[in-house]
């Protein structure tokens, strides 16, 4: 529980730092490369073998990732250091893969959903303790700021991960990661609508490759599972 909670905390903190230093699209797209790391970690952590089609997916996802680093995005108000932010986002994706694999492993055990919820709670508590010094000094507190914090804590984090921990008991780790791509697809749209943030062309191409490859792979797995049954 502690180890998976630490991976969860690292993923959360790294993703927040990534969104502060690169574009929202880059951060969410690169974090969504978690399926790549799940494929590599599957045989070790979950005893899920690597299939031939997984090797092709690894190559396509690696191509998508490379486009983010080839893209020469200039620093902006919402993305002061795109290169560093991209690295943080990739690392966050590794933490996300470890979290999904760990929650899946815990969900298979005797503790079930209770163990998964305890892990998420421990991860949030650890993330809070690590990030607490960054909150000081407190310059201004208003109702708008408090309402955003409450919304993020209750809905964006709390309710979302309650649903996630229950769902991971019934959905394979790889498919769970790809189902969550809806957030990935909508995130750049919200960032553009609210902040006017526009990622570079190569970054968008990399994001399309990553999302498209995982969707196709999930569809292929679903079709094959149906044929086998």
For the regions a protein language model found, what residue spans apply to each?
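Hydrophobic/small/kink-forming positions within alpha-helical transmembrane segments
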Residues: 5, 9, 13, 35-40, ...
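Hydrophobic transmembrane alpha-helices of multi-pass small-molecule transport proteins
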Residues: 8, 40, 50-72, 124-126, ...
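Helix-helix packing/entry segments at the starts of transmembrane helices
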Residues: 27-33, 103-126, 157-193
């Amino acid at each position: 529980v502690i180890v998976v909670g630490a991976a969860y905390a690292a993923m959360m903190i790294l993703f927040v730092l990534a969104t502060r230093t690169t574009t929202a699209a880059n951060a969410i797209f690169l974090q969504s490369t978690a399926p790549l790391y799940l494929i590599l970690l599957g045989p070790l952590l979950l005893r899920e073998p690597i299939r031939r089609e997984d090797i092709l997916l690894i190559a396509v996802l690696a191509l998508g990732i490379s486009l983010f680093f080839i893209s020469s995005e200039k620093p902006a108000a919402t993305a002061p250091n795109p290169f560093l932010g991209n690295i943080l986002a990739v690392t966050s994706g590794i933490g996300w893969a470890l979290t999904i694999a760990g929650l899946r492993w815990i969900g298979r055990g005797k503790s079930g959903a209770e163990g998964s919820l305890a892990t998420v709670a421990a991860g949030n508590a650890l993330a809070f303790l690590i990030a607490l010094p960054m909150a000081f000094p407190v310059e201004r507190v208003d109702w708008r700021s408090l309402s955003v914090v409450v919304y993020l804590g209750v809905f964006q984090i709390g309710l979302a991960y309650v649903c996630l921990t229950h769902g991971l008991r019934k959905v394979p780790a790889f498919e769970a990661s790809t189902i969550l791509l809806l957030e990935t697809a909508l995130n750049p749209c919200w960032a553009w609508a609210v902040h006017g943030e526009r990622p570079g062309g190569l970054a968008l191409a990399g994001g399309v490759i990553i999302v498209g490859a995982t969707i196709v792979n999930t569809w292929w797995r679903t079709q094959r599972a149906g044929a086998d049954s």
